[in-house]
Amino acid sequence: MAEYHIIMRISSLFALFLLFLQPALAEGLPELGDTAQLSLTPQAERRVGESIMRDIRLHDPDFADDPEVAEYLNAIGYRLVSNSQDARQDFEFFLVKDPTLNAFALPGGYIGVHTGLIITAQSESELAAVLAHEIAHVTQHHMARMVSKDGQLSTAVLAAMALAILARNSQLGSAAAAIGQASAITAQIGFTREFEREADRIGFLTLEKSGFDVRAMPAFFVRMQRAGRLYENNAPAYLRTHPVTTERIADAENRIQGVAYKQTPDSLDFQLVRAKLRADQGTARDALAQLEGDLREKKFSNETAARYGLAVALLRGKDPVRAEAELAPLLKTTDHPMFSGLLARIKQAKGDNKGAADTLRQALVRYPNNRSLNYAYIEALQQLGQNREAVSQLDQQIKNYPRDARLYALQAKGYASLGKRLLQHQAQAEVYVLQGSVSSAIEQLQLAQKSGDGDFYQLSSVDARLRDLKLQLAEETKQAKEKK
């Protein structure tokens, strides 16, 4: 019975991928079993990626909505992107709650990173090496080139892409044999060796230009190869989609020969993010015991990060008093936004919402552009009933990040508390737009029209947005009919 559910999951992912890919293609997809000419433009790749990401955010229980970790991943990611072959490409790096050691690239610049990769990375340069490799897959448009190889598109290739991108569970890979075209799918899973070599070469250059230790790349490959031999059929997930060959290791080792050694210490950001994720592993009791044991036995690379992780675990274990005591010495010696964020959460757990808001307000003076602190501050203001100030903060944040659904959701909540129904429905409409539900957004704008409040300019704004969305929905409906 379990195998049946696994197979159905694969089938649904494949169908989902076809559904997402279809609107983006200029010529449409072929019937199952046929082949056809295909051109997947960068714009189409982005639309495909956006569609898949919307589904991941809404329906994937493993999607980790952690602003602090996301902020770090995007900081290190864009440090690499700025030194890549296409710095103009938009990227978004996101976290996946999965203990396996893996990362993957979606079409259009979306790169998922498993918690297991961050936790087990032996250095920040090692994490950067994996990200640089995934960035190269995107900038070299390997997904589009895989689809259009030899000018042909086959159902097997599409199925393989769906599996490689979406089926992270090792059981899915083993159950793929139950699908009729198993041999063709197996042959296509993962990127081709040619693409892997190209991503290694370009990723290496990006890693070097970004100031990381390039020796981390072959070191990571060697570690993965050893893990593959040790675990055989239960090899790390990275090996199943990015096979590490002796040739790849040799190529990476040859590249570092001409590079002068440069000591590259890990950033405190990396150390803290890794400590936070370790504190979130397993049960609260097990995580706490592990972290206390590591500190007692001095099994850590950075004591500040280790004690921060312990404070996170203590708060998770509903002991805010001990958590604050553990954090207090760190606050005296080191200023970091993650410390301020944790202190605010500790104060909230102790029932001191005003103290939490004050902590966040003071931190934002030092870190005004920190998104996780801004989210937390707005939520703290709303908890205190200070909705006018919260809405004022949201207006500024939305100007900076106009495609952030979380901000619009908070804005809708704030306007609802203030009794501003038109603005509430208008904000909620933008949440639905960003989630890909245009019809739901239209319903919200129609409710805004009937709200009975709002001035002439606000009503005019609602009317204009409603017209635009109706045209968009009509065009999407037309395209869907043409594809049938």
Language model features with spans:
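Short alpha-helical catalytic segment bearing the HExxH-like zincin motif
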Residues: G112, E126-E134, V138, S174, ...
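Catalytic Zn2+-binding segment of zinc metalloproteases
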Residues: S125, I135-Q152
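TPR/TPR-like alpha-solenoid repeats
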Residues: I111, T120, V138, V259, ...
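Extracytoplasmic and endomembrane cell-envelope/extracellular-matrix remodeling and assembly machinery
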Residues: L32-S39, E50, D62, E71, ...
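Hydrophobic or amphipathic, alpha-helical segments that drive membrane association/targeting
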Residues: A2-F104, A227-L230, A289, N353, ...
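Membrane-active amphipathic alpha-helices enriched in small hydrophobic residues
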Residues: S154-N169, A175-A187
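Short pre-active-site segment immediately N-terminal to the catalytic Zn-binding motif
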Residues: G112-A129, I189-E194
